Regions:
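Acidic catalytic/metal-coordinating carboxylates
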Residues: 34-37, 60-63
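Short hydrophobic/Thr-rich beta-strand motif most characteristic of the beta2 strand and flanking loop
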Residues: 25-33, 41
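Conserved active-site segment of CheY-like receiver
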Residues: 8, 80-84
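Conserved sequence signature across two-component system core domains
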Residues: 6-7, 32, 50
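Alpha4 helix (beta4-alpha4-beta5 surface) of REC/receiver domains from two-component response regulators
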Residues: 63, 67, 84-91
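Conserved acidic segment of CheY-like receiver
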Residues: 1-12, 16, 20
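Active-site beta3 strand of CheY-like receiver
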Residues: 45-51
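The feature encodes the CheY-like receiver
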Residues: 12-13, 57, 81
Length: 91
């Protein structure tokens, strides 16, 4: 399974990469730090799953998800957040 991780906190993305790569069936193909990079990386790698933070500087995870899904409706995107803001969950 090929995964891309996008998070503006390098500690979070590094920890996720370490945890996921402990499974031999998972390959972290790339990591990024904002929504614009997520869009580029998705097009380049066409991962099985895009694991992305919701809140990032510049283009956030929600906007990036909409853009990716507009071009790749079959995309599987998991959004992460450490915030408990219900407004983001509802979106």
């Amino acid at each position: 399974m090929k995964i891309i991780i996008v998070d503006d906190d390098c500690l979070v993305s590094g920890a996720l990469k370490t945890i996921l790569e402990a499974n031999p069936d998972i390959q972290v193909a790339a990591t990024g730090s904002d929504g614009k990079e997520a869009c580029s990386l998705y097009k380049e790698y066409l991962p099985d799953i895009l694991l992305m933070d919701i809140r990032m500087k510049g283009m956030d995870g929600l906007e990036a998800s909409r853009k990716i899904l507009g071009e790749f409706p079959e995309a599987k995107i998991l959004l992460l957040t450490t915030f408990s803001d219900d407004e983001y969950i509802i979106k």
